[in-house]
């Protein structure tokens, strides 16, 4: 891990108020990380819909911490200690975190009247959002 390059990347993303979007993952999550240059919001979407009737998550995690590593110790056990250290260093910077095993799709929208951005996350092929996150609020520095 190159700390100087990592800091430079964090600065670029935060100073531009860019949102990091990721898809085709196995979990839906939203994380907001504070940096000296402002917050960074990352949205991960579980776009692999194996069960079109799964409209409620089996598991919801709201605490960012070492349980990400310890929950699956069999995955790359040789890197477990390093991953624990990375999570430990990152945890104090996390202001908001939500993760769930819910496949679906997300829609980012901006309200024309108040210029507020929000994410609506729909379970499977649902017609009503299961989760709504105020992205504008997360992008406001604390």
Model-assigned labels for residue ranges:
Residues 7, 11-19, 26-142:
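Metal-dependent phosphoesterase/phosphodiesterase active-site architecture
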Residues 1-4:
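Active-site His/acidic residue clusters
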């Amino acid at each position: 891990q190159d700390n100087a390059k990592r800091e430079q990347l964090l600065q670029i993303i935060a100073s531009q108020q860019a949102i990091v979007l990721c898809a085709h993952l196995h979990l839906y999550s939203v994380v907001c990380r504070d940096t000296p240059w402002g917050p960074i919001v990352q949205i991960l979407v579980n776009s692999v819909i194996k069960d079109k009737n799964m409209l409620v998550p089996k598991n919801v995690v709201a605490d960012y911490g070492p349980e990400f590593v310890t929950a699956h110790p069999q995955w790359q056990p040789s890197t477990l200690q390093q991953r624990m250290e990375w999570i430990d260093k990152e945890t104090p910077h996390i202001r908001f975190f939500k993760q769930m095993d819910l496949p679906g799709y997300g829609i980012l929208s901006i309200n024309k009247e108040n210029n507020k951005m929000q994410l609506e996350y729909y379970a499977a092929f649902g017609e009503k959002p299961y989760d709504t996150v105020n992205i504008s609020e997360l992008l406001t520095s604390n």
